[in-house]
Amino acid sequence: VRRQRQMCIRDRYYAEKVRKQNYALDEEMLRPYFSLENVRGGIFFLANRLYGITFRPIVVPLYNPECEAYEVLDADETHLGVLYFDFFPRQGKGGGAWCGYFREQRYRDGEREAPVVGIVANFTRPTATAPALLSLDETETLFHEFGHALHFLFHDVKYRGLSEVEGDFVELPSQIMENWATEPQVLAEYAVHYRTKEVIPEQLVRKIRNSALFNQGFATTELVAAALSDMDIHSIRRYEPFNPEAFEDNALRLQRGLIPQIEPRY
């Protein structure tokens, strides 16, 4: 009896093999051009070019010695805020990447109280022979979270309770910054091979752009499923204790036919 084996589309190992086969491109081919130091320099370059702001390393108390801190200066060199980076994993630290604030912007006694913002990630640490090298996805993630950081840093409201925005706007600044990450003019400024100092070749840039929609069918379905699950949960009319996993499985798989290879995102 011939059996067919289903492959989970989420398996990044095999997804990379397919991408390499279809586009002559894989993650490891790109990593040498995306050292963490260069990518950080790239987001600083872009922010300066777009908004005129600059970033100056400062010595301040850190909650972990691996963190970094920068003073953010406006085009006229006035103080906008402080930006912390916490790049590497450690025991007890949450996974993934996010941006948040330690202090929101507000006015106190007529004086602007600047925000203190943090970007947190879990990138691979540098080794004895190489700096921390990011994947293209991690590079776009850092640009994305930096967009959130800029949103916090640019706040200028009298009352911090009025600094929030509508939920459907929250991701706009981050999406804008994320899309800059692979623009050829921006790549030319920061995507430099950590050993040869060669700027990323145009041929590789074309491959990045040609493969930009690779595996997006899965990604889109995953996000739509998450949105549907969220709406289902918030449509419950009788508020009684329930099993979220069983509820989600029933809503997505039994009622909507979500294939098992796409697991619930959250």
What are these regions, as identified by a protein language model?
Residues 125, 133-153, 174:
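Active-site recognition of the HExxH zinc-binding catalytic motif
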Residues 63-64, 71-140, 257-265:
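Active-site-adjacent "gating/activation" loops or surface patches in catalytic cores
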Residues 35-54:
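Zn2+-dependent metallopeptidase catalytic core
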Residues 10-35, 180:
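Short His/Asp/Glu-rich catalytic/ion-coordination signatures at enzyme active sites or charged loops
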Residues 73, 79-82, 155-231:
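Acidic/histidine-rich catalytic neighborhood
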Residues 30, 36, 205-266:
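Pan-zinc metallopeptidase signature
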Residues 54-67:
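Long, charged, glycine-rich C-terminal linkers/tails
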Residues 1-9:
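Single conserved hydrophobic/aromatic residue that forms the stacking wall/gate
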